[in-house]
Amino acid sequence: MKKKILLFLMMLFMPISVLADTIYSVSMNVNILEDGTANIVEKWDVKADSGSEWYKTMYELNNSELTNYKVLMDGSELKYKEWDVDESLNEKRGYYGINDTYKGIELCFGKGDFKRHTFTISYTLSNYVFNTEDSQVLAWVLFPETNVDYFSAEISSYYKFPDTLDVWG
């Protein structure tokens, strides 16, 4: 009985290691061109504890098309390849790609290892701003719901935004 109690107490006070990826920050710069296209650059400061890839969901592209997708890890450009979500950490190291799902696309890139890194993701989206009968509309989820310690977004354009611009978010 003493052994069982001792074992229980040891288990009770043993440190528990929880594996959880950490996204310290994501900063976005969106530059809107005159034709409604947007050039977007995101910087992710992250540390992986498990898994093999990072990804960003883009499930509602509607009439927009994604082009010029590139990823850098700590300033070094990764290589594009057809993405296979089932590949290992080693197989995804140094690569990025696009995963097509029934909901839309996921921008994927290999974690490489379980250390802290800065990833720079850049891409272009057509029809980022679209026309209606009486106005022009920008309606995007800049970053899907996730646990990010700090998020910032800066939107710039050839056009000077008036102080009376209606913005919701």
PLM feature spans:
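Lumenal/extracellular ectodomains and adaptor appendage modules
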Residues: 18-169
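Cleavable N-terminal signal peptides
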Residues: 7-8, 18
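Positively charged n-region of N-terminal signal peptides that target proteins for export
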Residues: 1-4
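Hydrophobic alpha-helical transmembrane segments of integral membrane proteins
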Residues: 11-12
